Amino acid sequence: MSEFKNLPSEWKVVRLGEISSRVTRRNQDNRCQNVLTISAQSGLINQADFFNKQVASKDLSNYILLKKGEFAYNKSYSAGYSFGAFKRLKFYDEGVASPLYIYFKFNDDVCSDFFEFYFDAGQANRQIKDIVQEGARNHGLLNLSIDDFFNIKIRMPNLDEQKKIAEILSTWDEAINLTINLIESKKQFKKALMQNLLTAKIRFPQFKDEWKETKLGDFLEEKSERNTKNIDLILSVTNKFGFVTQVEYFDKSVASDNTANYKIVRKGNFAYNPSRINVGSIALLESYEIGILSPMYVVFECLKNLDNRFLKFWFQSHIFMGNLPKYLAGSVRESLNFNDMKTISIKLPNLKEQQKIAEVLTACDDEINLLNLKLENLKKQKQGLMQKLLKGEMRTCYVKKAM
């Protein structure tokens, strides 16, 4: 078992079958009705929650009954999991799942928490890769027998160090989950605040003027400038990230070789895909000075007396998204051209109040962006730690806990 290089002298290499046992208990008399599926991202979760319906048969007696803390291995390929996914039952006391998966539990003399991180970090992938030949799949499943599975080689420290490693990585998980929850809380706060500010339910005391109902067409102007200047920054608009470069989003340019007919979009302009606006694909260009978009996009700018950041938040709100279907009702493809956009009603305060509202909501976005940056840093720290701790390249005495 010498393929594990630079292994600390106190560590040893064992077969998975030496420290764990297969779980084969059946769901007799259909006792348990909690049908599970393995999600690469979410782990072992209720099938109805994952698919919004139960896809298993009514007779579950042949399903495997899994207890909390036990593991499942899904041999099928999924994005980011080329050699299958190991997941542990954490969210329920018990559940049943398809006999197609391999189930196992660790012996009492090892730390299951340690091995959860071990598998999450892909430490078993090299072993699985060596066992299965490239392309040796049966209906998308890796050609990995039960015997081969339990013959996988595992590197591990003694029990005390296993527990310390699991404790350290759990601290990072706690910090990550806390940050995720905080981000979600901030998003919900912004959503509620946005709804109240944009409907004048909450107002700043210095503003007393009545809001006026008007049409967007009174304040917008379409821009159709073509790419005669050979601009090469090709952009797309997404509902999640707003403006992105095509290379960044698609990992390649999907534009045609000749972009002379592409539309120019400048900082402060809006753009949207008429056939994707129903899912929120409309954005304000803030990160780049100038770029180009496919001719299918509509590009427009705000005229005076309409703050573009105020309009950005208005487009994000339920006031716009909730009423959008009625403007799409006559369109077979749920498409919104610019002439239809101009007919949409909007209630507006004066320009200074618009700017104040935009300032407050921008501050909310800044907080969320900082938390997202913190989250990404925590995830990178955890990934780096896992790779070093689980190989014995870094020992637990040198690790500071997550802040």
Specify the residue positions occupied by each region the protein language model found:
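Non-catalytic DNA-recognition/assembly elements of restriction-modification systems
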Residues: 1-27, 159, 204-227, 343
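A short glycine-rich beta-alpha junction/loop motif
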Residues: 2, 9, 94-100, 133-160, ...
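Amphipathic alpha-helical segments
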Residues: 7-12, 115, 150-187, 191-192, ...
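Sequence-specific dsDNA recognition surfaces
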Residues: 17-28, 32-33, 39-72, 217-267, ...
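A short beta-sheet element
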Residues: 61-124, 137, 248, 260-320, ...
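Acidic, low-complexity, intrinsically disordered peripheral segments
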Residues: 388-403
